[in-house]
Regions:
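N-terminal pre-domain/capping segments
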Residues: 1-100, 279-321
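Active-site-proximal loop/turn and secondary-structure-junction residues that shape catalytic pockets
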Residues: 26-30, 63-68, 111-115, 151-155, ...
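Aromatic- and acidic-residue-enriched segments that line the glycan-binding/catalytic groove
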Residues: 37-39, 125-126, 274
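Active-site acidic/histidine proton-transfer and metal-coordination neighborhood
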Residues: 45-47, 53-55, 59-61, 69-182, ...
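Histidine-acidic metal/acid-base catalytic patches
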Residues: 1-5, 12-18, 97, 133-137, ...
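Short secondary-structure transition/capping segments
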Residues: 34-37, 72-74, 119-122, 224-226, ...
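Short, contiguous strand/loop micro-motifs
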Residues: 1, 35-36, 79-83, 121-122, ...
Length: 321
């Protein structure tokens, strides 16, 4: 079977579903990237770029997949082994080159195994310094690339470094070029940290540090579920859309990303239902946010009638009077 043909058929699905962009891991673009020469990588990137162009799709970002390789079992950038840290950095710089080859201007750092299961196994202070050094090396490697840090508090490590957007923003300000370092907020990751996703987004937006979002949902403090957006907490989803809309998110070309997984193995058209369903919920919530009575809201705020405000919000979301 021609794998390139399979990939092109997959890309052909996106536009009809209403999606304009694609998010990649480096080895999605270049399978077996560790074993290829720069010339081979460039050749493969050209093939992928052509497929994207043929289907009118924009590559939003590329992320280095650093949690599968044996060199990253204890983290890449924060590994105790200098050799393993070198591998992680080399792979990351190569990912920047891949992004550039396919016409992409952003790299996402989901720090995955950068953390520990046992606190005493790493020096956390030095680990954070090493993450910052990595970010600065990335910025130096390409003078235009943006770096979007995706926080997560746990999984696959018990205690991950950079668990919240506050940590990511702090690293951005400490970097050699703060304007090019931002965050990517995933709903479920914020919830797993015990935080409100809309407040995390608001914090990043207040600092002009929201590069992108991964909208999904999470049913309690357990493994990262990547549930369809709004299916566990519809009001929470409404508030995420409300915060993004109020800040004008998207007006500078930012994407709304969905990081959702199918409930189970599917065949045929069912393989994309989680994507179309989440998009539909999102679009309905955009309409709910845009039709919300702001004058009524302000009246209730001025009167400090928060019971009435909460009821009005819920009735609006439910579509009842």
């Amino acid at each position: 079977i021609d794998k390139r043909l399979i990939k092109e058929k997959k890309y052909a699905l996106y536009k009809p579903m209403g999606f304009d962009g694609v998010q990649f891991h480096d080895d999605d673009v270049v399978p077996g990237i560790d074993d290829l020469t720069p010339a081979q990588i460039t050749k493969q990137c050209a093939k992928v770029k052509k497929m994207l162009d043929n289907n009118g799709l924009t590559p939003e970002f590329v992320a280095p997949r650093l949690w599968f390789a044996p060199q990253t079992v204890d983290g890449g950038y924060t590994a105790n082994s200098a050799k393993d840290r070198r591998y992680a950095l080399d792979r990351t710089l190569r990912t920047i080159d891949v992004a550039r080859e396919i016409g992409c201007g952003a790299i996402v750092l989901w720090l995955a195994r950068e953390g520990s299961y046992i606190r005493e196994s790493k020096n956390a202070r030095i680990a954070y310094q090493r993450i910052l050094e990595t970010i600065n090396a990335m910025l130096a490697h390409d003078k235009d690339i943006e770096i979007w840090i995706e926080p997560k508090p746990n999984e696959p490590t018990d205690a991950a470094y950079v668990p919240t957007i506050g940590h990511a923003v702090a690293l951005a300000y400490a970097s050699s070029d703060p304007k090019r370092v931002k965050g990517l907020i995933e709903t479920a990751h914020a919830l797993l940290a015990g935080l409100d996703a809309s407040d995390e987004m608001a914090f990043a937006l207040a600092h002009d540090k929201l590069g992108s979002v991964h909208l999904n949902d999470q049913n309690g403090l357990k493994y990262d579920q990547d549930k369809n957006f709004g299916t566990a907490n519809l009001r929470g989803a409404f508030n995420q859309v409300r915060v993004l809309e109020e800040a004008g998110y998207g007006s500078k070309g930012e994407f709304i990303g969905l990081d959702v997984k199918a409930m189970r193995t599917q065949k045929g058209k069912g393989v994309t239902s989680h994507l179309t369903g989440s998009r539909e919920i999102f679009m309905h919530l955009v309409e709910k946010v845009r039709t919300w009575d702001r004058k009524l809201e302000q009246q209730m705020i001025d009167a400090r009638d928060y019971e009435a405000l909460e009821l009005a919000v819920m009735k609006h979301i439910m579509g009842v009077r």
